[in-house]
UniProtKB/Swiss-Prot annotation:
The lineage of its organism: Bacteria, Bacillati, Bacillota, Bacilli, Bacillales. The keyword Secreted does not apply. It holds the Pfam family Acetyltransf_1. This is Acetoin utilization protein AcuA. Its EC number is 2.3.1.-. GO terms for biological process: acetoin catabolic process; butanediol catabolic process; cellular response to glucose starvation; cellular response to nutrient levels. Disruption phenotype: No visible phenotype on growth in medium containing glucose and acetoin or in medium with acetate compared to wild-type. After glucose exhaustion acetoin is quickly consumed similarly to wild-type. In the late exponential growth phase slightly more pyruvate is produced compared to wild-type.
Length: 210
């Protein structure tokens, strides 16, 4: 499968100034920009910057960024699922994972996350993919928002909905381990029925639930 990447951008006005939401960004461009030191949800900011540069260089890898002047203040990643996860078991070349989305506290509440997702989906290539994301409550920055688990889950769902991702049932043990965890997905308009059925088999290993 060829992974065409078509650049799109949208300017977002916030009280702190104009933020450019753009991508997919090349590894070279990513390396040129400053990476905000508060982008630490997954690993120290410098390490995360390096990880994004690496993802951007993968054939299927996509990084969409939120940029304030020359500094990255938010991003979303799309990449093949981790080989250790069940979502990679089918070796589906048209299934990619929204692996991480992060926005620094100063720019939260300005629709940056929603716009990152909306700009991601402007590329016609996204209609060829099943895009999944797995939400685990233990990854959520509850402290930074003063929200409880359910309020945060609702916020995450609304944000994912902005990119066309909706809730899907699954018997995955990690997701099933807490009712706030969930699988969300967006099935592109050009995805075949065969691929949808393969995705259904990945979602349910216990066939009686399927």
């Amino acid at each position: 499968m060829e992974h065409h990447k078509t650049y799109h951008a949208k300017e977002l006005q916030t009280e702190k100034g104009s933020v450019l939401i753009e991508g997919p960004i090349s590894p070279e461009k990513l390396a040129e920009y400053e990476f905000h030191d508060e982008l630490t949800a997954f690993r120290p900011s410098q390490k995360q910057h390096e990880a994004l540069i690496e993802i951007a260089g993968l054939p299927e890898g996509r990084i969409i960024i939120a940029r304030f002047r020359q500094t990255i203040v938010g991003y979303v990643t799309y990449v093949y699922p981790d080989p250790l996860e069940r979502w990679s078991e089918g070796n589906m070349e048209n299934l990619i994972e929204l692996g991480a989305i992060e926005v620094i506290p100063a720019f939260r509440g300005h629709s940056v996350g929603k716009t990152l997702l909306a700009v991601s989906m402007m590329d016609p290539q996204m209609e060829k993919y099943i895009i999944i994301t797995t939400e685990y409550y233990w990854h959520w920055d509850l402290k930074g928002t003063n929200k409880d688990v359910w309020e945060y889950r609702k916020m995450m769902e609304k944000m994912m909905n902005a990119g066309g991702l909706v809730w899907f049932a699954t018997d995955d043990p990690e997701i099933s381990s807490h009712p706030a965890n969930c699988l969300m997905a967006r099935i592109g308009k050009e995805v075949s029925q065969e691929s949808i059925e393969r995705f259904d088999r990945l979602r349910f290993h216990n066939r009686f639930m399927y």
